[in-house]
């Protein structure tokens, strides 16, 4: 249930009845402080200005016309014309009852869209490193959130699986008489890549053969295609290990690499020329964009085909957007790519729109993100200044979590201990990233992310175990809670109202691609439950009705924390 949407609709109706235009905005928000009610409507001032009225006078008229019977216990006008709405506790109690038994915590079904989400995008013949972490886990949180709401989500792993490097790798594998590349681990391939590059730079005959293999590969030579396929398969098998460890939903079926669009590139260049968008310039094919200026203030030229006939990333990205709309039937396309690629994407999409490949009604959204930094504020590196491999980072996370958890649980069975350690270690790395606004850089700090207090995965996972332990101690389950829910205390009301705001939060996350909003919400819920737990007797409540009511609040808290963390890809545990 989306209380904000319900109240917005009611306040808008009252505003229109009071003389406001039909497109007026009620601007209903969750109140920042309890003294201002549960929700506040802030749209009166802007409407009053348009109507030439005193804001307070309009607010009084709106309140007269506002029908919140059974929903609000009190409506107040504050300051120059804010309308404060206090929810009726009986109404809140009924909605909690509904959320407890309804599918998806009572979140209303959406009109399903086909949404393509582009994320992760590692390179073939390279190990994944920390630079892939943000795209992978933020993108996956978006995918999980959209799927929870009922959208048809297409995961698109835009793997770097094409280019001149493949001629070099195929030639080097042949040189080493090791065509059976599938027997090699990716670490060997990484070494092969370095050795192949060194040989390519130093041996002209080898370089000629490598370049010849590029041409053969691009023209569909069977031997080269087989070798290329092996390189891709080995890489993706190793990446799948990382995805599984990260509890990320990507599989080999989601790979849509650069090579997928190869056949489209000549057609796109020809079409852009035919439409008068692309022209020849010094042998290359260029699209000049008035929207972007070069340093001389002239329209910027974007090359889509080099004079040697080769294509560029921009050409591939144009084809990619076209394919996602025309072939996949996308209603919305999201790209989780770092902020440094913003201008490149904007230029490609400007061409896409001008060419009519994707209509304006289909959003192309760059959900950009900042960098992961070390404590020194510089890009996160190894002590020797090298790139941190993702597998090494996850190994260290589990090792550090192991020390933390094993210390506190000396009697936990080995299998359960291993599962808890893994959930906490991997969860800590993911949550530390997801809990920060994606648009900013963030500092990677082991001590902060593994802390058992503050907005961290270990704290949230512990908060969940604390709630479910109530039911273990009580020896009850949901089916035994048969009495109606009543709310008698302020702390009960605060927790119940916040729990009912889950739909507002998940809708915001889906619209804006901002998982940190979910993290902040879950942290709030955990804090409100903690206060409720400390001040309101649950198992020893003064009556059976209040005992069951408080157990129901605890039950919805557990379900909300678990579901919210699941949309982030964070695993919960029953004990910690």
UniProtKB/Swiss-Prot annotation:
GO CC terms of this entry: cytoplasm
Motif ('HIGH' region): 122-132
Reaction catalysis annotation: tRNA(Arg) + L-arginine + ATP = L-arginyl-tRNA(Arg) + AMP + diphosphate
EC number: 6.1.1.19
Origin: domain of life: Bacteria
BP GO annotations: arginyl-tRNA aminoacylation
This protein's UniProt keywords: Aminoacyl-tRNA synthetase, ATP-binding, Cytoplasm, Ligase, Nucleotide-binding, Protein biosynthesis
CDD domains assigned: Anticodon_Ia_Arg (cd07956), ArgRS_core (cd00671)
Compartments in which it is found: Cytoplasm
Database matches in PANTHER family: ARGININE--TRNA LIGASE, CYTOPLASMIC, ARGINYL-TRNA SYNTHETASE
Family indicated by similarity: Belongs to the class-I aminoacyl-tRNA synthetase family.
Name under which the protein is recorded: Arginine--tRNA ligase
Source species of the chain: Yersinia pseudotuberculosis serotype IB (strain PB1/+)
Gene from which the chain derives: argS
């Amino acid at each position: 249930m989306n209380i904000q949407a319900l109240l917005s609709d009611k306040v808008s109706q009252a505003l229109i009845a009071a003389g406001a235009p039909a497109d007026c905005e009620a601007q209903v928000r969750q109140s920042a402080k309890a003294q201002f009610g549960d929700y506040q409507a802030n749209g009166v001032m802007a409407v009053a200005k348009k109507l030439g009225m005193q804001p307070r006078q309009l607010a009084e008229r709106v309140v007269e016309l506002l029908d919140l019977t059974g929903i609000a216990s009190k409506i107040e006008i504050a300051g120059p014309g804010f309308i404060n709405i206090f929810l009726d506790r009986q109404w809140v109690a009924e909605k909690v009852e509904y959320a407890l038994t309804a599918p998806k915590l009572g979140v209303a079904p959406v009109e399903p869209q086909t949404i393509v989400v582009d994320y992760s995008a590692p390179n073939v013949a390279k190990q994944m490193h920390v630079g892939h972490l943000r795209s992978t886990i933020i993108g996956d949180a978006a995918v999980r959130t959209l799927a929870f709401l009922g959208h048809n989500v297409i995961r698109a792993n835009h793997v770097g699986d094409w280019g001149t490097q493949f001629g070099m790798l195929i030639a080097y594998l042949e040189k080493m008489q090791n065509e059976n590349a599938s027997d090699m681990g990716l670490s060997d391939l990484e070494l092969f890549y370095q050795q192949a590059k060194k040989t390519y730079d130093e041996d002209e005959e080898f370089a000629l053969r490598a370049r010849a293999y590029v041409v053969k590969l691009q023209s569909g030579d069977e031997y080269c295609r087989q070798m290329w396929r092996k390189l891709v398969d080995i890489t993706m098998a190793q990446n799948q290990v990382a995805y599984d460890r990260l509890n990320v939903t990507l599989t080999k079926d989601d790979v849509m690499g650069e090579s997928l669009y190869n056949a489209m590139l000549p057609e796109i260049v020809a079409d852009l020329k035919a439409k008068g968008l692309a022209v020849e310039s010094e042998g290359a094919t260029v699209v000049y964009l008035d929207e972007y200026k070069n340093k001389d203030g002239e329209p910027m030229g974007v090359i889509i085909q080099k004079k040697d006939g080769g294509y560029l990333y921009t050409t591939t990205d144009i084809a990619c957007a076209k394919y996602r709309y025309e072939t996949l039937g996308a209603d919305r396309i999201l790209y989780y790519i770092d902020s440094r690629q913003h201008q490149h994407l904007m230029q490609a999409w400007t061409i896409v729109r001008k060419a009519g490949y994707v209509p304006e009604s289909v959003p192309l959204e760059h959900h950009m993100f900042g960098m992961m930094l070390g404590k020194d504020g510089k890009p996160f590196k190894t002590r020797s200044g090298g790139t941190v491999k993702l597998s090494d980072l996850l190994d260290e996370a589990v090792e550090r979590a192991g020390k933390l958890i094993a210390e506190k649980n000396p009697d936990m069975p080995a299998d359960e201990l291993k599962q808890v350690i893994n959930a906490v270690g991997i969860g800590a790395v993911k949550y530390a990233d997801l809990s920060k606004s994606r648009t900013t850089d963030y500092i990677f700090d082991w001590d902060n992310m593994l802390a058992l207090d503050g907005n961290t995965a270990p704290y949230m996972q512990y908060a969940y175990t604390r709630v479910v332990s109530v039911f273990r101690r009580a020896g009850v389950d949901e089916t035994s809670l048969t009495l109606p829910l009543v709310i008698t205390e302020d702390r009960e009301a605060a927790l119940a109202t916040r729990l009912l705001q889950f739909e507002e939060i998940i809708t915001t996350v889906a619209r804006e691609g901002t998982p940190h909003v979910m993290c902040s919400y879950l942290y709030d819920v955990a804090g409100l439950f903690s206060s409720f737990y400390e001040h309101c007797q649950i198992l020893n409540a003064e009556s059976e009705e209040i005992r069951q009511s408080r157990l129901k609040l605890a039950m919805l808290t557990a379900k909300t924390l678990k579901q919210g963390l699941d949309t982030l890809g964070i695993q919960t545990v029953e004990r910690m």
